[in-house]
């Protein structure tokens, strides 16, 4: 009898604990897929919860504000967050993926592998390039349906990034390579001003009087998306259309997820924020993403009702 009572108590405790754990993560399911890269493996963590049909992607694991806010967004509002896990020897998040093949160590930027031209620009050894291509294609199949289109119910793909504070850069050459809204402006480049390294990729730039930090901006693939985020008060950068991205130039096609999406006419949004001071602003960007999703969803429903 005592054994039966003890068993019942343990069972009740286990059920309560499971219910508590489920409540703690608010229904967020975490799945980890392991992808081979040479003789090494890379963990891809996928957080998902019912709600808005939005996929967020964090390619760089050292950008911890982006990683934290991506998980937070899924927990609060739903959707899906894909995180590429990359840790150094101390267990800290790092930007690049380190891997080995046949006893030789290599390293790559996971956001420079999605196009053939981008992989060529990274100058991988001939025996490594097919391995990187295969890894990139399998990663895309996690992010997108069949690795080439939005998943059912989704309206756009969202990347989340953090960048280094441009004000911390002292040398002019360093400032020119810093990722800011100004860095995408061809007009500033024509005037030989600093911070214009990335203007080859863009069609236009909008600078908002509501934005206090040039490191905070939204990068979009279509004019319609640009209009929405302008109205929201953000700095906005518009990527070149697909026809203008088909140039075998590393300054244009760098192998990034944005270029891959642009070449395939996949609506794409990148939320960039200062790695030190951009948390509040990036959270506002994520909230705007959900407003955009539900706005587009309502528009789609209204269009169906009119038919």
Q: Which sequence ranges carry the predicted segments?
A:
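Bacterial N-terminal signal peptides
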Residues: 7-16
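Structured catalytic-domain cores with a bias toward divalent-metal coordination
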Residues: 24-306
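Positively charged n-region of N-terminal signal peptides that target proteins for export
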Residues: 1-4
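Boundary at the C-terminal end of the N-terminal hydrophobic targeting segment
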Residues: 18-23
């Amino acid at each position: 009898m005592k054994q039966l009572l003890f068993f019942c108590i343990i069972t009740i405790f286990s059920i309560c604990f499971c219910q508590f754990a489920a409540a703690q993560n608010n229904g967020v399911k975490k799945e980890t897929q392991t992808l081979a890269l040479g003789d090494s493996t890379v963990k891809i963590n996928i957080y998902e919860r019912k709600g808005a049909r939005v996929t967020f992607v964090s390619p760089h694991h050292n950008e911890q504000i982006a990683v934290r806010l991506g998980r937070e967004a899924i927990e609060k509002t739903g959707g899906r967050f894909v995180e590429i896990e990359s840790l150094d020897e101390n267990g800290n998040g790092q930007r690049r993926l380190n891997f080995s093949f046949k006893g030789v160590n290599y390293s790559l930027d996971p956001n420079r592998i999605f196009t053939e031209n981008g992989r060529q620009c990274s100058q991988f050894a001939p025996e490594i390039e097919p391995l990187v291509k295969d890894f990139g294609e399998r990663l895309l199949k996690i992010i997108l349906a069949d690795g080439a289109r939005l998943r059912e119910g989704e309206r756009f793909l969202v990347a989340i990034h953090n960048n280094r504070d441009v004000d911390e850069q002292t040398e002019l050459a360093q400032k020119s390579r810093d990722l800011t809204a100004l860095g995408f402006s061809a007009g500033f480049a024509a005037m030989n001003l600093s911070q214009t390294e990335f203007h080859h990729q863009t069609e236009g730039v909008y600078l908002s009087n509501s934005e206090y930090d040039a490191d905070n901006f939204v990068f979009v693939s279509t004019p319609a998306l640009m209009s929405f985020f302008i109205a929201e008060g953000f700095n906005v950068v518009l990527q070149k259309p697909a026809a203008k991205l088909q140039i075998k130039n590393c300054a244009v096609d760098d192998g990034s997820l944005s270029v891959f999406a642009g070449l395939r006419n996949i609506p794409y949004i990148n939320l960039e924020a200062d790695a030190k001071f951009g948390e509040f602003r990036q959270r506002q960007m994520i909230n705007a993403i959900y407003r955009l999703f539900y706005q587009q969803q309502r528009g789609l429903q209204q269009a169906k009702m009119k038919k």
